[in-house]
From Swiss-Prot:
Pfam families: MdoG. It comes from the Bacteria. Gene3D superfamilies: 2.70.98.10, Immunoglobulins (2.60.40.10). This is Probable glucans biosynthesis protein D. The keyword Metal-binding does not apply. The keyword Signal applies. It is found in: Periplasm. Belongs to the OpgD/OpgG family. GO terms for cellular component: outer membrane-bounded periplasmic space. GO terms for molecular function: carbohydrate binding; catalytic activity. HAMAP family: MdoD_OpgD. Probably involved in the control of the structural glucose backbone of osmoregulated periplasmic glucans (OPGs). PANTHER family: GLUCANS BIOSYNTHESIS PROTEIN, GLUCANS BIOSYNTHESIS PROTEIN D. It comes from Shewanella oneidensis (strain ATCC 700550 / JCM 31522 / CIP 106686 / LMG 19005 / NCIMB 14063 / MR-1).
Length: 540
């Protein structure tokens, strides 16, 4: 994966210049106005209410492309060259103040080629931070700061907390991407401000944070506040992030979204991760490591109270699923497997990757949690996307308000009180020692926690299995003492004439009462000519 010093983005970023078309009447404190174009002054009044008004009016104007040209010395850089750029510690924001936070800025270059405007905010006054090459150390790169334009701008920013001034707790860099860490201080999956038209038969649109306002934290406060303006051909937005580091870093997010035009698929609170190889999916299992992933499952807490665990996969073709819900209580991409032995990677430490849990504030109405799984042969490619998609059509002129909490870290703040899935294994079906006469797929799901450790030896635990097609056989549910839980096991015999995906649901019950969260899975049977029976020689 890319260095922890900067979050990765998987889009071709648009370039940004510093003006937008707005009418003079809505600029309020942004008083500089000429021919309908607004440029940010050096110091002006600022509030979140103003930012929402600014974004709302911007959405009524035609989108102005932000494309520009970087200096040649910053074009075509390698990742190693870009990593030579370091913001000087002595230039960090709030370094000389009694603050629990410091902020450093990212230099433009590589594929971070779109300047953003960054402002310091204190006591309701915003002042733009002017670029200066003296802020940066260019290391062994061939770039000479003295030859760069004085109005170059920045690519993004990152923050550190008083527990460790050398390591980031959050970073915003590229389009509307950002990342954060929990107590493990380990970057992993990313989030975005908004997703537009993901996994449709047309190019995805990547809205961009074009301006940031970094509010100076109060002395002794462990919360840092950031405001952001989002812009794209289809939508604008105003965002507020209250960032609180801890065992789980918490972000309180308020978003006001203003569509410029109808949007076919809007993604609210989008998450981006990577899954290449896991215990349940070894399609690309040629690597010496047994597991390679930033996240291993999508967790959902539905509006009706059901807890669902959906293991991720690396399909051979793009896979899209929508899980309908109303007023969801939470969803997220989690890294449940925390065992180093399962990864054996002492370079990137996948077992330390943070989970990210989204907790909606208020009612989000009807919609669906949507999951996109993209084939990948490369662990540096983020191939997993999840977000909330509202059911109501998105039309221009609307104001869409969303508030939610984001929790970054090892364990989400809220989990199912029932037993949870800890492992999912798959393989060839059938009975050991007996000749296989037809193809089947074996599924093994381990559950632990909840009330399982308290069950008596005579408890009649049953696996409740449902499938959209195919036949279930050789099913069982039995104690698994190694995890102080239970193991559900069954085979699926797919239809002979179909390679359509099969949707599976499993949970454990006793006396008709659920004991576990719901395990949900989608499996695509192979074509008939690839359904090998793998019978041993003496069983041929």
């Amino acid at each position: 994966m890319p260095s922890l010093e900067a979050p990765s983005t998987r889009s071709r970023l648009q370039r940004m210049v510093g003006s937008v078309l707005l009418t003079c009447s809505v600029l309020l404190s942004l008083s500089a106005c000429a021919a309908g174009k607004a440029s940010a002054p050096q110091e002006e009044e600022f509030s979140y209410a103003w930012l929402k008004g600014y974004a709302h009016t911007l959405a009524t104007e035609s989108y102005v492309s932000h494309k520009g040209e970087l200096p040649k010395s910053l074009q075509g850089m390698s990742w190693d060259d870009y990593q030579q750029f370091h913001f000087k510690k002595k230039a960090a924001l709030w370094r000389e103040d009694d603050s629990e936070f410091r902020a450093e800025l990212f230099h433009l270059g590589l594929y971070f080629d779109t300047p953003v405007h960054i402002y310091q905010l204190e006591n309701g006054k915003a002042k733009r931070i002017e670029y200066s090459p003296s802020m940066f150390d260019y290391g062994k790169s061939k770039v000479k700061g003295s030859q760069l334009p004085k109005d170059l701008g920045f690519a993004g920013f990152r923050m550190q907390f008083n527990t460790d001034w050398q390591r980031d707790v959050v970073a915003f860099l590229g389009a509307s991407y950002f990342r954060a860490v929990g107590q493990e201080m380990q970057y992993g999956l990313s989030a975005r401000g908004l997703a537009v038209d993901t996994a449709l038969p047309k190019p995805e649109e990547f809205p961009m944070f074009t301006r940031f306002w970094l509010e100076k934290p109060q002395p002794g406060s462990n919360i840092a506040t950031v405001y952001a303006l989002l812009d794209s051909p289809s939508v604008t937005g105003a965002y507020r992030f209250d960032i609180e580091p801890g065992e789980r870093l918490k972000m309180k997010v308020d978003a006001a979204i203003y569509p410029r035009k109808a949007i076919e698929r809007l993604g609210v609170a989008p998450l981006t991760s990577m899954f290449m190889v896991g215990e349940n999916d070894r399609r690309t299992g040629y690597d010496w490591r047994q597991e390679i992933h930033d996240s291993d499952g999508l967790a959902m807490h539905t509006g009706n109270g059901e807890w669902i665990w959906r293991p991720l996969g690396n399909p051979s073709n793009l896979r899209f699923n929508a899980y309908s819900d109303e007023n969801p209580k939470g969803f997220g991409l989690l890294q449940r497997d925390r065992n180093f032995d399962h990864y054996q990677d002492d370079g990137v430490f996948y077992e330390k990757r943070p989970s990210l849990w989204i907790e909606p504030t208020g009612n989000w109405g009807k919609g669906s949690v949507q999951l996109v799984e993209i084939p990948t042969l490369d662990e540096t490619f983020d191939n997993i996307v999840a977000f909330w998609n509202p059911a109501e059509p998105i039309q221009p002129g609307q104001e869409l308000l969303y508030s939610y909490n984001m929790y970054w870290g090892g364990i989400p703040p809220e989990q199912s009180p029932r037993a949870r899935v800890v492992d999912t294994f798959t393989g060839i079906g059938g009975v050991v020692g007996q000749k296989r006469k037809y193809y089947s797929k074996r599924f093994v799901i381990d559950f632990a926690g909840g009330s399982l450790p308290m069950l008596g030896k005579d408890a009649q635990v049953k696996a409740v299995i449902s499938t959209s097609q195919g036949r279930v056989e050789i099913e069982s549910a039995r104690p698994q003492h190694a995890i102080n839980g239970y193991r559900a096991m069954f085979d699926i015999v797919p239809p002979e004439d179909s390679v359509e995906p099969i949707n599976l649901r499993v949970y454990l019950e006793v006396d008709g009462q659920p004991l576990t969260e719901t395990w949900m899975y989608q499996w695509t049977p192979p074509p008939m000519n690839e359904r090998e029976l793998h019978n041993a020689g003496h069983l041929q």
